[in-house]
Amino acid sequence: MSRDTTTPDDAAAFEAAATTSGTATSAGENIPGDLLPLCREHICPVCPEKAQADEQRLRALADLENTKKRLQREKDEQVRYAAETVLADLLPTLDNLDLALQYGQGSAECRNMLVGVEMTRKLLLEALGRHGLEAVGEAGEPFTPELHEAMSHEDRGDMPADHVATVMMKGYRLKERLLRPAKVTVSRTPG
């Protein structure tokens, strides 16, 4: 529902503009392009419907821009961490290679096999590292709950309290996202 907000002076100006151009018009049809903005400016300078429509248009444009930005952020996040599930599935393989190296150290018969296992582990870590995977959790570093999962405490006089005493299972991080915390024992002062 539109209201007629024209005054007699506005109507006269519109009629004069239409007569001057030699074109009779109804509701702004057939007005030359240079007269149309002038007519709109004088007939409805503060039309509430136009102001409301302009506000709705600006809000819709702002919503569109925000949606575009959000979708781009989500896409970037997906691309950045696309390999997360595959890399997480490979972590038990790395654990088994570490266990094979750990338990085969004492056997002379396994020496040649251990060289092959060590080379395989190194190649796998290098390949995964190119995709952003890195190991976390080293003995002697300060215990950090964001990176380490404390499995037990260990009385240690040779290191400060609340440091990683033993790494039971390495943790891994993909770029800034932790895939698995390192399972560690935490030192405490004997007493």
Curated annotation (Swiss-Prot):
Protein name: Protein GrpE
Keyword terms of this UniProt record: Chaperone, Cytoplasm, Stress response
Secretion signal span: none
Main location (coarse class): cytoplasm
GO MF term set: adenyl-nucleotide exchange factor activity; protein homodimerization activity; protein-folding chaperone binding; unfolded protein binding
Domain of life: Bacteria
Stored PANTHER family: GRPE PROTEIN, GRPE PROTEIN HOMOLOG, MITOCHONDRIAL
CDD domains, per the entry: GrpE (cd00446)
Organism: Nitratidesulfovibrio vulgaris (strain ATCC 29579 / DSM 644 / CCUG 34227 / NCIMB 8303 / VKM B-1760 / Hildenborough)
